[in-house]
Amino acid sequence: MTIKLIVGLANPGAEYAATRHNAGAWYVDLLADRHRAPLREESKFFGYTSRINLAGEDVRLLVPTTFMNLSGKAVAAMATFYRINPDEILVAHDELDLPPGVAKFKLGGGHGGHNGLKDIISKLGNNPNFHRLRVGIGHPGDKNKVVGFVLGKPPASEQKLIDDAVDEAARCTEIWLKDGLTKATNRLHAFKAQ
């Protein structure tokens, strides 16, 4: 079992680039930078794409340029074109239920109210069985404040924790493709940025 497509969820445009909701895209941006494979806009995939070699595997990167709640359009377009199955897709997204500094891998499950995940599940034929990288951003403590929170920028101290977790997740993704998901998961799930 391998990963052929890594997706970083985001809202498009400079005004959203530094917001918590774009944490998934920060991870894909980091992978692209590390592998000197700049993301380029490809309209047929409704996003920015690139290709990298990860532990000997050919992996495509995607950051949709649709708004978050239409992310599935981009993911389905690329998965269909390259004949990539849902269980060969890793979707990185911001996670309210994890604190900043923590990231976790997960296979399948619901969307937990995340509109990007909701649309991807729908556009993959109601198939939730893709991998996720949950990037912790914390929770504002009141569900009525969630929208403003995810569309806000984290303070510098939280940003550093999120960046450190994203950095560790990128390392663990390479471990996954080289040594298997169990080893990668054990390492990532033991990590907490200080």
UniProtKB/Swiss-Prot annotation:
GO process annotations (BP): protein quality control for misfolded or incompletely synthesized proteins; rescue of stalled ribosome
Gene3D superfamilies, per the entry: Peptidyl-tRNA hydrolase
The keyword Manganese belongs to this UniProt entry's keyword annotation: no
Pfam families in alphabetical order: Pept_tRNA_hydro (PF01195)
Swiss-Prot/TrEMBL catalytic activity: an N-acyl-L-alpha-aminoacyl-tRNA + H2O = an N-acyl-L-amino acid + a tRNA + H(+)
One term of GO molecular function: tRNA binding
Source species, domain of life: Bacteria
Enzyme Commission designation: 3.1.1.29
Site (Stabilizes the basic form of H active site to accept a proton): 94
UniProt similarity note: Belongs to the PTH family.
Lineage: Bacteria, Pseudomonadati, Pseudomonadota, Gammaproteobacteria, Enterobacterales
Organism: Klebsiella pneumoniae subsp. pneumoniae (strain ATCC 700721 / MGH 78578)
Keyword Hydrolase appears in the UniProt entry: yes
Site label Discriminates between blocked and unblocked aminoacyl-tRNA, positions: 11
The protein's name in its UniProt record: Peptidyl-tRNA hydrolase
Positions bound to tRNA: 16, 67, 69, 115
Entry GO CC: cytoplasm
Leader peptide range in chain numbering: none
